[in-house]
Amino acid sequence: GVLPLKNPEVSLFGATATSPVYGGTGSGAVNTADAPSYVDALTESGLTVTNTALLDWYREEEYGRDFSSSGEEINEAKWSAIQKSDAASTFGNGEVAVFVVGRVGGEANDLKSTNHVDGGYNPLGADVSANSDYLMLNKNELGILAGLKELKDAGKISGIVVLINSANPVSAAFLNDETYGIDAAVWIG
């Protein structure tokens, strides 16, 4: 298997890679002022994050979540937009791809498993939510995983790890779907 990582180089993907879920909402919220980023944590563990330019792109294009107003905001980029970004040359060089999925919920922000409005919140107006279940991956998230599988099949990345960053359960049927070629998953709560 791909874990433990033998290759010290990783690329991070997913809007949650730039805006980690550190806690819940309401009384489950935590002070994140001194909380490490994924890049900091991985670097301190002896790994090299090869695509920090993509993470900068996520921030510049306003992908990510605004946890303070609603827990149901999945604002993930489309794979086609990632490929067209200036940062596309910073990944696909034999490293392990780590796709970070995040879901937040808690007091005063209960997670609904149904009736999620297609499209969700997105300041850019893009269609970012294709299914009706916040606990499932949306079409953009699944599109990134499919794109990563294409890179893996072409020998451009050496593996795919999904990092589930949620204190709440997430529907994980996608993990065993061969469409996405996932080699390992870690739930970090």
Question: Which residues does each predicted region cover?
Answer:
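C-terminal non-catalytic regions of proteins with extracellular/luminal or membrane-system context
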Residues: 1-189
